[in-house]
């Protein structure tokens, strides 16, 4: 029992270590102060509020995760398709494994995103509207790198975090992780259309979030594209190399279940083969 708790503490420690970069960078909140050219039209767009706010995005992700994971693991444990040698309750152990893996991948994804944001400091499309430069101090004949912003310091700092999109990377990570979870867990014949339908809406939400970041003038299209790719990459690597979703036991993979349903038994094969 004590050994099991050591493993739990080790898992928690790993998640915390993976979270350190984005925690530290967020607390310091000092991105690279990149300058600009007066004639740069890519940062002259008007400021617009978020279509998908942080609260709305968190609500959708948390709801989808709780509903899919809790119901999926409950059904598999109840039907004895999923079991654990843990000292804890089978359902608790199953939920712990999925959520622990999910949180670890989320920490990695967010840390990678914030490293790029704070180290590169790319200006958002609405930077000049947020900055509100004091043009009397600006020499437009060259590269402007002096501090000339009259806008809110907090908003100006936020306007320096364009590359790459955190909404896109985190949204794609979470939704693709859940889509792969559904692929691994929802593997019965009656779910052949239900499974891709659920996966479509999960991934479509992540892509929609990315589109809104461009239309809201929060990110350049390349910021969103890189964010989506990074989120997808981290989700795939986490599911393939950290989780046990596609291991044969537990649970049985979809391929094994389907093959066992399609293939005739050994005795039936031999009987048919002996006929003249």
From Swiss-Prot:
It is found in: Membrane; Cell membrane; Early endosome membrane; Endoplasmic reticulum membrane. The lineage of its organism: Eukaryota, Metazoa, Chordata, Craniata, Vertebrata. This is Phospholipid phosphatase 2. It holds the Pfam family PAP2. Keywords: Cell membrane, Endoplasmic reticulum, Endosome, Glycoprotein, Hydrolase, Lipid metabolism, Membrane, Transmembrane, Transmembrane helix. Magnesium-independent phospholipid phosphatase that catalyzes the dephosphorylation of a variety of glycerolipid and sphingolipid phosphate esters including phosphatidate/PA, lysophosphatidate/LPA, sphingosine 1-phosphate/S1P and ceramide 1-phosphate/C1P. Has no apparent extracellular phosphatase activity and therefore most probably acts intracellularly. Also acts on N-oleoyl ethanolamine phosphate/N-(9Z-octadecenoyl)-ethanolamine phosphate, a potential physiological compound. Residues 164-167 are annotated as: Phosphatase sequence motif II. Residues 117-125 are annotated as: Phosphatase sequence motif I. It comes from Rattus norvegicus. Its EC number is 3.1.3.-, 3.1.3.4. Magnesium-independent phospholipid phosphatase. Insensitive to N-ethylmaleimide. One of its GO terms (molecular function) is ceramide-1-phosphate phosphatase activity. One of its GO terms (cellular component) is endoplasmic reticulum. The chain crosses the membrane at residues 5-25, 52-72, 88-108, 162-182, 190-210, 226-246. Residues 212-223 are annotated as: Phosphatase sequence motif III. Its main location: membrane.
